Amino acid sequence: MTIKLIAGLGNPGPEYSKTRHNAGVWFVEELARSHNISLRPEKKYSGLYGKGLIAGNLVHLLIPTTFMNRSGQAVAPLANFYKISVDEILVAHDELDMLPGVCKIKKGGGHGGHNGLRDIIDRMANNKDFYRLRIGIDHPGHRDKVTGHVLGKAPSAEQAKIEQAIDEASRCLDIWLKDDLKKAQNRLHSFKAE
């Protein structure tokens, strides 16, 4: 099984582009840059869309331009149109329960309170079997501070760690698509940002 669709979650507009909640967007932007795939607005998928070869595999890239809690409105129509099964989808998103500089790949699971994941699960007929790239942004310590934290910008040292982890995740995606998931996970999960 290979990955055919990679979606990077976030909120649209310049006021959100540098916020922690857009870490998934940063990953897809990095993939587009490093693989020379242009992303263009596509109304029928409610997002920025492009396709190209990554490690010899045709991959669809999507950045929903809906707000985070409507991410499924973008992901589901694209998956349906190209007949991409749920387990051929990778969703990149910010993860409160991991430190900046850490990224992990997992398959399936709940939404963990993440509204973007919740909407995708809802619009995929409650099928949770897609892969996730969890990009650590850390937890602010109290649930009342979560909204301000995810919609805030990371301090520069923290941001640098997030970007290093995203770069490594991009390299590991190539390993995953060329070789196997386990090899990519072993490398990515042992990565430590400086």
From Swiss-Prot:
Primary localization: cytoplasm
Alphabetic keyword roster: Cytoplasm, Hydrolase, RNA-binding, tRNA-binding
GO BP terms in the entry: protein quality control for misfolded or incompletely synthesized proteins; rescue of stalled ribosome
Disulfide bonds: none
Catalytic residues, chain numbering: H21 (proton acceptor)
Site keyed Stabilizes the basic form of H active site to accept a proton: positions: D94
Its EC number(s): 3.1.1.29
Record-level Gene Ontology MF annotations: peptidyl-tRNA hydrolase activity; tRNA binding
Keyword Oxidoreductase tagged: no
Compartments it resides in: Cytoplasm
Assigned GO CC terms: cytoplasm
Catalysed reaction equations from the record: an N-acyl-L-alpha-aminoacyl-tRNA + H2O = an N-acyl-L-amino acid + a tRNA + H(+)
PROSITE patterns named among the record's database cross-references: PEPT_TRNA_HYDROL_1, PEPT_TRNA_HYDROL_2
Site feature location: Discriminates between blocked and unblocked aminoacyl-tRNA: N11
Main enzyme class: hydrolase
Residues the record lists as binding tRNA: Y16, F67, N69, N115
Family listed: Belongs to the PTH family.
Function: Hydrolyzes ribosome-free peptidyl-tRNAs (with 1 or more amino acids incorporated), which drop off the ribosome during protein synthesis, or as a result of ribosome stalling.
Complex formation: Monomer.
Protein name per UniProt: Peptidyl-tRNA hydrolase
Gene that specifies this protein: pth
